Amino acid sequence: MIETSQTIPELVSWAKDREFSLNLPTERLVFLLAIAIYNNERLDGEMLEADLVDIFRHTMNAFEQSTDAIATRANNAINELVNNVVNRFSSEFTEGLAIYRLTPLGVGVSDYYIRQREFSALRLSVQLSIVADEIQRASDSAEEGVENNESEHFWRRNVFAPLKYSVAEIFDSIDLSQRIMDENQQSIKDEIAELLTKDWQAAISSCERLLDETSGNLRELQDTLNAAGDKLQAQLLRIQDCVIGRDDLYFIDQLITDLQSKLDRIISWGQQAIDLWIGYDRHVHKFIRTAIDMDKNRVFSQRLRNSIHHYFDHPWFLWTAQAERLVDLRDEEMVLREDDALGELPEELQYESLSDLHDQIVEHMQGLLIAYRENNRPIDLSLVLKEQLENYPLSRHFDVARIIVDQAVRLGMANDDLSGIYPDWQAINKRGAEVQAHVIDKY
């Protein structure tokens, strides 16, 4: 634990001394949120009691409650919030009119329910951009501190402070937003379950929309995290390299470790959430398909009866091809046709087993890659894959790429793998396939 953090006994004593408690019924929570929204629109951040009474009146209208004795009820509600989420100030200068301001606890609670509900790829991109700038400046300062042998004060001000009070807080905000998305996923699951239990036929389109929207949002956010994650980890490693062996800067090393763990946890849970949602998506589709299979005869017969019943309102024609085949369908002992197909298949349609393809590629790649080894030339897998995939149809690209990589890694390894730096993604075909691999330069 870094030295600026508080221990559990200290936090317990601090909360106990201030008598913190949270017991907000729905009506009081709505009242607090309304106060927070109104407070955000004011320049001075101060509110009068008349303002709070008006806000209370609006919230009661939303609950369709009586407005009788509204002033008394509003005063009771205000008194319940005072000293917990609202502070009251009064003096002789205010002539008996009290001034109200939200407490830090009130700001925190309302901020969670208002601003944290908005989680989008744009917001995440902005947050990650701010983090990248802060880490970049901190890493530059760290290298400057090493070169100039700066004092501990320099490291605390220019390296520790930005990481602790900017980067770490944004990571916590992203983590909190992910937890809110977990709640949203659960609410969507409940909504889908309710739709399917009522009328699954009418609910299919709604379920598809909810599933697709959630899958798209999760994938978009995870792509944004993945795009920035490697660069952020690389910058953190730069700072960590600067403090290695410096016992006086242990607090920075511990903070870097915490930030790396947070970033790994955020990215890992984002991918895990996608995998879990994909599993749920498949489960729902399987349920729908099963329901359709069990109900298809009744649905078809019902539609057929309706179409015949309304034939004169909306006449229709049934077009058939080879009508005698339709008559044959009534024969319960019909024998399947076993006519042999004669002639030769075009070359494009001829079957080639995967084992034959594997042997051909292995033989070719061994001859190609051994030349690299004999001449001690590095193997750029992305370039080799790109050149070789051009010789094969798209349907074989996956198997060909797998075989090439398998043969290449048997010859040697990449020194960059030991540095902890992630390689860049490189395109290997025209359909958007990419590979992430260091150059093999050690045999």
Curated annotation (Swiss-Prot):
Keywords attached to this entry: Calcium, Cell cycle, Cell division, Chromosome partition, Cytoplasm, DNA condensation
Keyword Metal-binding listed: no
GO cellular component terms listed in the entry, alphabetical order: cytoplasm; nucleoid
Span list, region Leucine-zipper: 211-239
Organism domain of life: Bacteria
Cell compartment(s), UniProt: Cytoplasm, Nucleoid
GO MF annotation terms: calcium ion binding
Segments passing through the bilayer: none
GO biological process: cell division; chromosome condensation; chromosome segregation; DNA replication
Main location: cytoplasm
InterPro entries named in the record: Chromosome_partition_MukF, MukF_C, MukF_C_sf, MukF_M, MukF_M_sp, MukF_WHTH, WH-like_DNA-bd_sf, WH_DNA-bd_sf
Function noted in UniProt: Involved in chromosome condensation, segregation and cell cycle progression. May participate in facilitating chromosome segregation by condensation DNA from both sides of a centrally located replisome during cell division. Not required for mini-F plasmid partitioning. Probably acts via its interaction with MukB and MukE. Overexpression results in anucleate cells. It has a calcium binding activity.
NCBIfam families: PRK05260.1
Entry-linked HAMAP family: MukF (MF_01803)
Subunit note: Interacts, and probably forms a ternary complex, with MukE and MukB via its C-terminal region. The complex formation is stimulated by calcium or magnesium. It is required for an interaction between MukE and MukB.
Stated family: Belongs to the MukF family.
Protein name, as recorded: Chromosome partition protein MukF
Native source species: Haemophilus aegyptius
